[in-house]
Amino acid sequence: VSEEDARQLQRGNYDLTFVIADGLSARAVHAHAVPMLDAVLPRLEGWRIAPIVIACQARVALGDEVGERLGSELVSVLIGERPGLSSPDSLGIYLTWQPRIGRVDSERNCLSNIRSPGGLPYELAADRLVWLMKAARGQKLTGVQLKDTGFLPP
């Protein structure tokens, strides 16, 4: 985060911060970030959500610094995944409890291949993400210690 951008991130008392990052596929973010947010936000009634942060040429770890600066309990990074042979536009979501600089990948949960058609549909991804968010708040952790075994698709 640049010094100028850091000044824009006003600390608050937030349950959740969303960071939208182009990552390795701007196409994925352009196609799927808004429909994904449209699916998940109505499921978060009563949550204190920080202003959405949009980042260019960003990686997942940026969410740690953004979430820490904003004083957020959880950060959810929506990011364009590395294009593959069959899917050049998959969106990934990385969820981190108590974001701060220095978090490692094993401290995050990931949903991947979110796209419609052909991947994890937005509504199902939203159900799974909200389940993970609630479980993270209850157990006060994310990552390899937080298993989504309690999630059953409809």
Q: Can you say where each PLM-predicted feature lies in the sequence?
A:
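C-terminal functional extensions of proteins
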Residues: 81-89, 94-154
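Glycine-rich phosphate-binding loop
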Residues: 64-92
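Electropositive phosphate-/nucleotide-binding environments in soluble metabolic enzymes
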Residues: 30, 34, 60, 119-127
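Gly/Ser/Thr-rich loops at beta-strand to alpha-helix junctions
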Residues: 23-28, 58-59, 81-85
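Active-site rim loops that border cofactor/substrate pockets in soluble metabolic enzymes
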Residues: 41-70
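A glycine-rich, hydrophobic loop/mini-helix early in the fold
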Residues: 1-24, 28, 35, 39
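Gly/Ser/Thr-rich active-site loops/lids in small-molecule metabolic enzymes
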Residues: 34-49, 95-108
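Structural motif
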Residues: 15-18, 50-53, 73-77, 93, ...
